[in-house]
Amino acid sequence: VHGRFGQQVEVGDNAITINGQEIKWFCERDPANIPWGDLGVDLVCECTGVFTSRDKAALHIAGGAKKVIISAPGSNVDATVVYGINHSMLTQAHQVISNASCTTNCLAPLVKPLHEAMGIESGYMTTVHAYTNDQQLSDVYHSDVYRARSATQSMIPTKTGAAVAIGDVMPELAGKLDGLAVRVPTINVSLVDLTFNAGRETSIDEVNQVLKQAAEGDLSEVLSYCDDPLVSADYNHIPYSSNFDSLQTRVNGSLVKVMAWYDNEWGFSNRMLDNSIALLSAPE
């Protein structure tokens, strides 16, 4: 998906070495058995998709780590953090946080400036999402009947909590947004399609200008603005959380539709790194 890794990698009995830097590896079912403390590990990125609740992710702390970031929506975590939106609230008191989902990371940089400029009364989001490894390549059993169907053969409607999770990041929007997902037969890069009722009438030009100013200002690290006729493949390996497509904006009075692309792998991985740095450097 992202090409060859252009660094020198060597594999040993219990470690891999990248450009001379040794990284130990372990095979454990219980994170508490990994000797993070002995290794001097400050922060663990919990990316298994298994330990997404606070109590389970905190097993890494039992193993000696100081902080944990979950690469998924988390339950009962100290905070759900979308970098660029609410990461400034982090303090050293936060031990286990969620990086939210790739879709929430795309949606939040759209709704924040739009809500501040014209108010979002209510809205629905659809994410047209590349298939992932939680789906099947051919029809086979899965606890979710939709995800039991072949990812390469169908457009598959399924659920997402990405829109609802906006309320965890921006409390002023709690209960105002909902959404669903459609998994499609592409390997990477997804699309957020957001339709909302603004607090007043607006125009295509105003909506685009609000997001352009945000992309050039406070949200420049996570939001990009595009006025070229691009497609999903053009956004592969792009590090922004959200790539606003200004050519797709539609407005009818106070009813607004906007779209943004996101590399659901690479963009989200960059935000894991950003939030890791933000958490470790957070004030007391």
Regions found by a protein language model. Give the residues of each.
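NAD(P)-dependent Rossmann-like dehydrogenase/reductase catalytic/cofactor-binding core
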Residues: 239-284
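A generic structural signal for alpha-helix starts
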Residues: 105, 202, 266-267
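Acidic active-site catalytic centers that drive phospho-/nucleotidyl reactions
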Residues: 42, 46, 193, 263
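C-terminal substrate-binding/catalytic lobe of Rossmann-fold NAD(P)-dependent oxidoreductases
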Residues: 1-35, 119-122, 127-256
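N-terminal Rossmann-like NAD(P) cofactor-binding subdomain of oxidoreductases
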Residues: 1-148, 250, 272-274, 283
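Short, intrinsically disordered, mixed-charge
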Residues: 49, 62, 116, 168-171, ...
